């Protein structure tokens, strides 16, 4: 199955967080928090203004983004857990 986001929605795949701290302590899966970073897999066409004009999204496929731990709607596609969320739910793009 393939998803195509509508309007100002984006599809994000969570990026796993580090399982070891800087001091070398291993964090078990049960204690690890949900990652709050992800990679944008797909973007919608944009948001309509009151005049009907289409405003393109500022994020693009491949961007690494920050979002709230409980943001978006979780969906499973081909065994992968993905998030569908509005661009407004994203906090920032991580620059490389």
Curated annotation (Swiss-Prot):
PROSITE patterns: CHAPERONINS_CPN10 (PS00681). The keyword Chaperone applies. GO terms for molecular function: ATP binding; metal ion binding; protein folding chaperone; protein-folding chaperone binding; unfolded protein binding. One of its GO terms (biological process) is chaperone cofactor-dependent protein refolding. The keyword Cytoplasm applies. Coiled coil: none annotated. It is found in: Cytoplasm. It comes from the Bacteria. Gene3D superfamilies: GroES chaperonin. Pfam families: Cpn10. Its main location: cytoplasm. Keywords: Chaperone, Cytoplasm. GO terms for cellular component: cytoplasm. InterPro entries: Chaperonin_GroES (IPR020818), Chaperonin_GroES_sf (IPR037124), Chaprnonin_Cpn10_CS (IPR018369), GroES-like_sf (IPR011032). Belongs to the GroES chaperonin family. HAMAP family: CH10. Heptamer of 7 subunits arranged in a ring. Interacts with the chaperonin GroEL. Together with the chaperonin GroEL, plays an essential role in assisting protein folding. The GroEL-GroES system forms a nano-cage that allows encapsulation of the non-native substrate proteins and provides a physical environment optimized to promote and accelerate protein folding. GroES binds to the apical surface of the GroEL ring, thereby capping the opening of the GroEL channel. This is Co-chaperonin GroES. The lineage of its organism: Bacteria, Pseudomonadati, Pseudomonadota, Betaproteobacteria, Burkholderiales.
